[in-house]
């Protein structure tokens, strides 16, 4: 990242702080399903992050028809993502931008969560209230409202990813950004079984619980989501 080419010099420090926050947060994480950050620094006005080289494809490549993954692979993959998020949340870190493009499947079929670029360290004194960060399609209602978020925002985003990988379309869509954000915050998500009648009831329940707008009704931890996904995977193999 060229720090000397930022058009508004007064924003350099803010951008630098956000850039190095990725290294600070992700550098604390050591998990087989999270891309490893090795180093970060600044040299000759160039900010850099050295990270694990991941060769493979992102889930974005398999989020639209006719390229949808087989059902068992979808469930297994997102269970691994949920494991990674549960670990990060236990370290006090919320990803805040979970989406198919940030989930890689390597050539060896390993799942890797990447890009903690807007991750929020729960212990940080810098408030995120009234600051909306993330990719709009995958934002939780509390992110849209600018409220303080925790790991349940990542659970909601992972629920959207699950819906998308199962159906080939996101649960919320609109003609403009304002309408999209309003839909996520206020409209019920479509029932996934209307688009995929072949899905087992347990998987439908998992999608519904992950996409609950009210926090008390949503999965409390990503680990609970991973557990239910593996129970579903077991039932598929039975």
What are these regions (language model features)?
Residues 229:
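Hydrophobic "lid"/C-terminal helical patch
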Residues 218:
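Conserved HRD-motif arginine in the catalytic loop of eukaryotic-like protein kinases
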Residues 198-211:
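Conserved C-terminal C-lobe helix
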Residues 214-215:
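Short helix/strand-capping hinge loops at secondary-structure junctions
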Residues 1-190, 233:
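Conserved ATP-binding/catalytic core of the eukaryotic-like protein kinase fold
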């Amino acid at each position: 990242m060229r720090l000397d080419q930022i058009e508004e010099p007064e924003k350099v420090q803010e951008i630098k702080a956000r850039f190095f926050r990725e290294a600070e947060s992700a550098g604390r994480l050591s998990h087989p399903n999270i891309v490893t950050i090795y180093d970060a620094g600044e040299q000759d006005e160039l900010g850099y992050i050295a990270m694990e080289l991941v060769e493979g494809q992102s889930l974005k490549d398999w989020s639209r028809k006719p390229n949808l993954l087989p059902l068992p692979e979808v469930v297994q993959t997102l269970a691994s993502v949920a494991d990674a998020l549960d670990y990060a949340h236990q370290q006090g870190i919320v990803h805040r931008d979970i989406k198919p493009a940030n989930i890689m499947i390597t050539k060896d079929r390993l799942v890797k969560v990447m890009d903690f670029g807007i991750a929020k360290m729960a212990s940080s004194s810098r408030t995120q209230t009234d600051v909306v960060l993330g990719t709009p399609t995958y934002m939780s209602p509390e992110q849209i409202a600018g409220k303080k978020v925790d790991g349940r925002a990542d659970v909601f985003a992972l629920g959207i990813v699950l819906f998308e990988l199962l159906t080939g379309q996101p649960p919320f869509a609109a003609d403009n950004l304002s309408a999209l954000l309003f839909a996520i915050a206020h409209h019920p998500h479509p029932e996934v079984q209307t688009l995929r009648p072949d899905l087992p009831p347990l998987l439908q329940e998992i999608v519904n619980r992950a996409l609950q707008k009210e926090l008390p009704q949503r999965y409390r931890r990503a680990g609970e989501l991973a557990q239910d996904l593996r129970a579903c995977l077991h039932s598929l193999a039975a």
